[in-house]
Amino acid sequence: MAKAVTIKVKLVSSADTGFYYVAKKNSRTMTDKMVKKKYDPVARKHVEFREAKIK
């Protein structure tokens, strides 16, 4: 079997609320860490979410 191109990553809120999203990322084209601005329902505003490893 071939190695999977897409991997699942955890996007953790930079507001330190403990909230996170799970996203897919193409490991061949996106070699750097993913950063997205998304809504954090705990903080009730849009904040940056940074990539972390799923344990």
UniProtKB/Swiss-Prot annotation:
GO terms for biological process: translation. GO terms for cellular component: cytosolic large ribosomal subunit. Transmembrane segments: none annotated. Keywords: Ribonucleoprotein, Ribosomal protein. GO terms for molecular function: structural constituent of ribosome. Disulfide bonds: none annotated. It comes from the Bacteria. SUPFAM superfamilies: Zn-binding ribosomal proteins. Belongs to the bacterial ribosomal protein bL33 family. This is Large ribosomal subunit protein bL33. The gene is rpmG.
